[in-house]
Amino acid sequence: MTTATTSGDLQLENRVEALLDLATRAGADAADATVFGSDQISVGRRMGQVETLERADSAGVDLRVFLNGQIAQVSGSDLTDNGLARLAERAVGMAKYSPADAFAQLADPDQLAQNLPILETFDPVEPSTGAMLDRAAEAEEAMLGVEGITNSGGVSAGWTKSSLVIATTNGFLGSVQSTRHGLSVSGIAGEGEAQKRDYDYSLAVFGEDLKDPREIGLEAGRRSVRQLGAKPGATAQVPVIFEPRVAVRMFSLLMGAINGESLVRGTSLLADHIGKTVIAPELSVFEDPFLKRALGSRPFDGEGLPVQERTLFDQGVLTTHLHNLATAKQAGVNPTGHASRGGASIGIGYANAWLSPSEQSVDDMLKDAGEAFYVTSLMGQGANMITGDYSQGATGFWVRNGELAEPVESMTLGGKLQDMWLAMSTANDLTWFGGMGTATIRMTGLTIAGA
C-alpha cells in the first residue's frame, strides 16, 4: 500500500482501513473513503460583552463503492465497528440499483501520490479561550475608536484543528492535519438609514501569522466610515479598478472557466481555448500546492493523485484545464490532480492559485487611470459562463485626478468576460484569500451604469 502521511491521525487511519475492508466484504469491487475529524473553538463579542463562547468537535466518514460499473456514495458519523459495517452494507445495497457510470474510477496504482513533502499546515499551539477573547477585545476597541463609528457589528475569533484521511482499495492511504486561526471585525458608521457597515478579517494556519488585532479593528472602522454619504454615480465608461478583496471574485470567474466539470458539461466558455491567449499577455496564473504555512496547500488531491506546481496561464495563454479522474476520462485527457472532496462526491479544486502581480503600485495605477471607478464591494453572481456576459452590482469610490474621491453605490457593471480578461492588468499588492491570491486588478471596456 502507498502510504502518504503528513502528521496524520492514526485512529482515523485505522477507521478508514476498517471501512474499506468492510465494503469489500459486503461485495464491493472497489471503494474509496475519507474519514475526518475536527475540533473547534469560537468566541464572539459585541460592544464589550461576550456573546458566544463555544467548543465543538465532530467526526464523519464518506464512502464511495464500485460494483459492476455502478457506484454509490454515502456519508455517516458513526465510526464504531457496527456503524461502519452498516454504512458499507448500505452503500453496496444502493450501488446494485444505481445507474452505470462509465467515467467514475479509482486511480491506477502507479498514478498515486507518494514521497510527500511536509507543508507546515498544522500549528501545534492551541489558543486559550482567554487569549482569543483578548484578541477580540483589542480588535473591537480599536474599531470603536475610529472617528465616525457609531456601533459594533460584532467581532469573532475562531480556531479549528482538522484531520483528514483518504484511502482506496487499490493501495492509497494519505492523511493530513491542518489548523486555521481567524479573527474578523464588523463596524457600523452613521445613523439610521444612512448607516454603513464594513469589516476586516485575517485567516492563517499559524496563530502567530494573524494580522495584529488592532490593525484589523482600525481597518474595519475606516472601511465603514469612508462609505458615509455614498450616492449613485453617473453612467460612464471608464477604467474599473477592483481592490484585492473583490478582485479575487473576478479571478475566481477565470478559474471557474477552466474547471473540468464545466468543460464536460458544455458550460465553459474556455472549452476549446488551450494554447490560445485568454488573458492579457503580461499576466500569468500560477498554482503551487506546496507553499509552506499556506491555507490552500495540500500534499495530494481528493483521489490520492499527486499535485504539482503549474503555470495555468503562461503569458496570457491557457495551458490546461483542471481535471479529476472522471472528467479527464470523459474529456479524453490525463487527470491533473485537481480532485476535491465534498462529502462522498468528487469535484474539482485547486491549491494556492494566484494571478501574477506587476511592479506598479496601486497609487500609480490610480494616477495612470486619471478617472475611474474603484470597486470595494460586489453584489450578486452576474456572470454567464457559457456566453461570457457579465453584469454585477457594485459600490466603491469614484477616482478623480488619480485619487479616490466621493463614495458611490448602486452601480451596475456590464461587459464581456472575454474582453475583460484580455484588457486587465494588476498592481503589486498581491493578497491571499485562502487558497487564492490576487493583487488589485484594473479592467477596461466595462460599462458602468449609475443614476
Which residues fall in each region the model found?
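Dual-mode signal for accessory low-complexity, basic/Gly-rich regions
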Residues: 271-451
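Active-site bordering "gate/hinge" segments
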Residues: 1-298, 302-305, 314-317, 401-403, ...
